[in-house]
Amino acid sequence: MMSHTETSLGAENTRTHNFITQIIDEDLASGKHKSVHTRFPPEPNGYLHIGHAKSICLNFGLAKEYQGLCNLRFDDTNPVKEDVEYVDSIKADVEWLGFKWEGEPRYASDYFDALYGYAVELIKKGLAYVDELSPDEMREYRGTLTEPGKNSPYRDRTIEENLALFEKMKNGEFAEGKASLRAKIDMASPFMVMREPVIYRIKFSSHHQTGDKWCIYPMYDFTHCISDAIERITHSICTLEFQDNRRLYDWVLENISIERPLPHQYEFSRLNLEGTLTSKRKLLKLVNDEIVDGWNDPRMPTISGLRRRGYTPASLREFCRRIGVTKQDNVVEYSALEACIREDLNENAPRAMAVIDPVRVVIENFESEAVLTAPNHPNRPELGERQLPFTKELYIDRADFREEANKQYKRLVLGKEVRLRNAYVIKAERVEKDANGEITTIFCTYDPETLGKNPADGRKVKGVIHWVSAVNNHPAEFRLYDRLFTVPNPGAEDDIESVLNPNSLVIKQGFVEQSLANAEAEKGYQFEREGYFCADSKDSRPEHLVFNLTVSLKEGF
């Protein structure tokens, strides 16, 4: 596993070096290409996840680095699973990450007429045929990794027959599954992808871009390479599972009349992040079964989920930079992702105080009300100061008080002193409990001479705890998020529900300081001694503040 022993954020603009940049450098030096043109080609059948962020940063990053172009293209060849909701979310995610595509977004469906023409060209060259094997029969004829496939009985139809049948497919004269157009290559090929794959199938489904114009749709492997060539993509970059598909990519382009030079496909290792799931099918099941609160649930590995959790674009870009681009599959520790957001927020997030599990404190010798000031960031004076109302009654966190404690406990103990953050030293004098023995109130005294300085008599007060006024505050809901799964590789589990973490969300009710009344959604704060939080973009509002835990203050805290 890759650890996160890295330098802090800020290396975004340094020159990257990997096997792809080496290829590009050679291509530009040799004159093979005069410029760089990449693309990010998601299928709009789900929300983008952290793995897509790596691909986005790579493709858009290369275009930026080489002063080239990067297209956003939707590979929308399966109308059954696709939706405009996903199109819109993908555009929003790419822009939020800080990237802008070349021109308007493109769609593979923009090229359906051209793709149909290229399919006809293959038929005329004797390189494609209409097959009427059922899907089950086709699987049976395909063979195995150790046995060659068998030719379809429909393989030797004449060009004229195939042209007429393909026209019938286009006109809706075949039912779904009753006919398909296949590439005519080699059923004995050692590469399964080359055993005469289907390149067009019938689907009587309305398409989100083309409506009901088509009832035949091209397959991904046929569409993708031609779309790259139409758009004059120079370097078509995808993940390693498409390595064998490159043979079909090249075969299609070499056998049609399309402008040269042809694009070339390069593969890199996909992101495998410890403890997360990136299968769209399994993520969709979590959403549909209401195990999570939609695609943007803060526990989801989606870009929109990470955004709602409080991750920043800079932290995700930095994470992608650190993990790099290789051809070797590896698993990245989740702590590497957390380190990036923790460093970002430590440097940039304003500080505030929040009491998540409150217990009441009464300062018996404090009769007035004071307004104290505190810096918004200890190392960033330009971020200014905030006012903290200090009142007779306060809230502190229940975990910050004990009636008895050993010397290692540096918080408030009965009969002993502690400093309140940005305020005075107080001493716990006595407690009040309810019928169940639960402490309801801690009665204290304060030392008025200790605001911003140590006690005059030299006594040592070692602990510091945070607090919120019990009078001037805002009630808040705190959503304490943890990992969604209890195992490092949930994708390998047949039943993902069996490895769900029952404590992936714990909800607490407490209070935040007055300055957070209008906390901006998704803006990160360090709640001192608690963690990094942000206001929830979906549920938080001034009359009902909701804060999401983004990440703990320290690794493994």
Curated annotation (Swiss-Prot):
- Provide GO CC annotations from the record: cytosol
Picking any one GO biological process from the record gives: glutaminyl-tRNA aminoacylation
> Which gene does this sequence derive from?
glnS
Sites where the protein binds ATP: 43-45, 49-55, 239, 270-271
What's the Enzyme Commission number for this chain? Answer: 6.1.1.18
Where along the sequence does the record place the motif called 'HIGH' region?
A: 42-52
Q: Lineage of this protein's species?
A: Bacteria, Pseudomonadati, Pseudomonadota, Gammaproteobacteria, Pasteurellales
List the protein's name: Glutamine--tRNA ligase
Q: Which reactions are catalysed by this chain? A: tRNA(Gln) + L-glutamine + ATP = L-glutaminyl-tRNA(Gln) + AMP + diphosphate
GO molecular function per UniProt: ATP binding; glutamine-tRNA ligase activity
**Keyword vocabulary terms for this entry:** Aminoacyl-tRNA synthetase, ATP-binding, Cytoplasm, Ligase, Nucleotide-binding, Protein biosynthesis
